């Protein structure tokens, strides 16, 4: 009797899991454990022929500057630390204007946003985006990066209230995950 109840409980849990995951639209692009993307984020999928090489967690700020001429906050730059662990432990590098990601060992990648990409699963956070390598320097974790995905963002949006004076700077906290990819066959890119 007790074994039958345990079996029924596990069957119920399995059914709940199947129903829960089947109701969430997810695009599963197999880039060797890259992120699962919501259905409306297909534009940030990485091209075939690339594989995941590194995954980092970022915590920092998005910097904005008030432009009194346009009455808008202009994006200036990111400033964040990169971590190996989701609890922001094990600092491995930094992220700054360029945009540039630099490892503590000295390798870096500068990238550009791929035009026409991006999605906003959370309207209260900066967009998820796809970037392609512009240049790399040094040897290490970023030396052969071809693409970068920014996903699972929180915060970072421009302020909603106007600035008090032209040139005023605001730093808005944000977190994100960055997935770094390399070509499966480096000689093909």
Q: Which sequence ranges carry the predicted segments?
A:
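Bacterial N-terminal signal peptides that target proteins for export
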Residues: 2-13
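Short, flexible coil/linker elements and helix-boundary hinge sites characteristic
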Residues: 4-5, 21-22, 71
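Bacterial N-terminal signal peptides
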Residues: 13-22
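Sec/Tat signal peptide C-region and signal peptidase I cleavage site
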Residues: 23-28
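Primary mode marks residue(s) on the alpha4-beta5-alpha5 output face of response regulator receiver
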Residues: 29-63, 70-189
